[in-house]
UniProtKB/Swiss-Prot annotation:
Its EC number is 1.6.5.-, 1.7.1.17. InterPro entries: Flavodoxin_fold, Flavoprotein-like_sf, FMN-dep_NADH:Q_OxRdtase_AzoR1, NADH:quinone_OxRdtase_FMN_depd. It is an enzyme of class 1 (oxidoreductase). Binds 1 FMN per subunit. This is FMN-dependent NADH:quinone oxidoreductase. Quinone reductase that provides resistance to thiol-specific stress caused by electrophilic quinones. It catalyses: 2 a quinone + NADH + H(+) = 2 a 1,4-benzosemiquinone + NAD(+); N,N-dimethyl-1,4-phenylenediamine + anthranilate + 2 NAD(+) = 2-(4-dimethylaminophenyl)diazenylbenzoate + 2 NADH + 2 H(+). HAMAP family: Azoreductase_type1. FMN binds at residues 10, 16-18, 93-96, 137-140. Coiled coil: none annotated. Its cofactor is FMN. It comes from Shewanella denitrificans (strain OS217 / ATCC BAA-1090 / DSM 15013). The gene is azoR.
Length: 197
């Protein structure tokens, strides 16, 4: 049975197109017997990385209460990620990039010596053998264009921690009129239906 960790990051709640598409995929995969864990990074945000937190992420004996709390949360998030086979990320495009809420999660799980390490031949990810599916929604048309910073960024950061099998599902033109919206969502759902857990 596949164990799937789902990350939602839209700030739009019930109006979120990316969350609706994630729900479609979850229903599809649950019928296949997948076990799902959902973390809504907008409804339950993680702290923003700052100087105090960055220093505390290195560990040590003299951490402030805040540093220890965030380090414990980082450990929890990493353990959660490690315990799942597949990572599903809802990544709506906000101003050509991912939501802040998703970036904050990445900042807490990308840790030297824990999810990646440095070797004589360069960095090596420590979370190998996992798969990621990214569902990305956009108001306009950005796929494979210079304005799409989501795909190269997520490919890079996921690959850096060892997750190199990454599939992207796009829902585009969602702010370009009812017909374009319907077509964009239909194409995304069709792509999601072709994926197996």
């Amino acid at each position: 049975m596949a164990k799937v960790l789902v990350l939602k990051s839209s700030i739009l709640g019930d109006y979120s197109q990316s969350s609706a598409l994630i729900g479609h995929l979850m229903s599809h995969w649950q019928q296949q017997g997948a076990q799902m864990t959902v973390r809504d990074l907008a409804a339950d945000p993680v702290p923003v990385l700052d100087g105090e937190i960055a220093t505390g992420m290195r560990g040590g004996d003299n951490l402030s209460p805040r540093q220890q709390q965030v380090l414990d949360l980082s450990d929890e998030l990493i353990a959660e990620l490690k315990s799942h086979d597949t990572l599903v990320i809802a990544a709506p495009m906000y101003n050509f990039s991912i939501p802040t809420q998703l970036k904050n999660w990445i900042d807490l799980i990308a840790r030297a010596g824990v999810t990646f390490t440095y070797t004589e031949t360069g960095p090596k990810g420590l979370l190998e053998g996992k798969r990621a599916v990214v569902v990305t929604t956009r108001g306009g048309m950005h796929k494979e264009g210079a304005s799409d910073h989501i795909v190269p960024y997520l490919k890079t950061v996921l690959g850096f921690i060892g997750i190199t099998e990454v599939e992207f599902v796009y829902a585009e033109a969602l702010n370009m009129g009812p017909d374009a919206t319907a077509q964009g969502l239909l194409e995304a759902k069709t792509a999601l239906d072709s994926l197996t857990a």
